[in-house]
Regions:
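Face-selective signature of the C-terminal outer-membrane beta-barrel domain
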Residues: 46-60, 89-179
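Structural alpha/beta core scaffold segments of enzyme domains
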Residues: 85-87
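Outer-membrane beta-barrel domain signature, especially the mid-to-C-terminal portions
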Residues: 28-30, 68-70, 83, 123-125, ...
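Transmembrane beta-barrel wall of Gram-negative outer-membrane proteins
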Residues: 1-65, 90-91
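Extracytoplasmic loops and strand-loop junctions of Gram-negative outer membrane beta-barrel proteins
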Residues: 21-27, 37, 76-83, 93-94, ...
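Flexible, surface-exposed loop regions and adjacent strand-edge segments
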Residues: 2-16, 69-79, 126-135, 174-179
């Protein structure tokens, strides 16, 4: 790889003081890993030939993910950041689909999909020799409902539907003195 991505040294906080430590192997990207968990559950219920109900739940979470390109930045000949990482990302989604396949006066097939998503992510940074840790958090709640239908009319087919989407987005920042 490029020499610019080597890590000859890194910052470690020892007894409340940011200390620059020589890396025994500059090719090792110290403190650059993260963990991740994903989960998916699906359930289907078909009580008869006309109705089909499906529910799914998805969940994902990561641990802290260091921003390696920021942790190797220099300013005035010394490492700029003591900390720079993405905080845990959390996401979950509930999704319910109901399909009705029976000819009525207004449709031949209709599908209702209702979903809810909850998402959170954050960014944390602290410059070297500074006791203030900055944390920026983003929160998103998303609700949606969609109804689609088809109807055969003579030799043609009509497709129509309705949709509602509501996103609530929030963001806040905080500064914490770590000393």
């Amino acid at each position: 790889g490029q020499d610019g991505y080597l890590r000859p040294e890194y910052v470690e906080r020892i007894n409340g003081i940011d200390s620059i430590i020589k890396n025994s192997d500059p090719r090792v990207q110290r403190f650059s890993g993260y963990d991740q968990l994903n989960f998916l559950q699906k359930i289907r219920f078909k009580p008869n030939e006309n109705w089909n109900l499906q529910y799914s739940f998805a969940y994902a979470k990561t641990g802290d993910a260091p921003r390696y390109d920021r942790l190797i930045q220099y300013r005035n000949g010394a490492l700029r950041f003591a900390e720079w990482y993405y905080g845990p990302m959390k996401w979950n989604m509930h999704n319910l689909q109901i399909l009705h396949s029976k000819k009525t006066s207004i449709y031949d097939d209709a599908r209702l999909t209702v979903a809810y998503q909850d998402y959170e992510e954050s960014r944390i940074d602290r410059t070297r020799a500074n006791n203030n840790r900055n944390r920026q958090v983003e929160l998103v709640d998303a609700i949606s409902a969609n109804w689609d239908a088809t109807k055969t009319v003579g030799k043609g087919e009509i497709f129509y539907g309705l949709e509602y989407v509501h996103n609530k987005v929030g963001s806040f920042g905080e500064r914490t003195n770590i000393s």
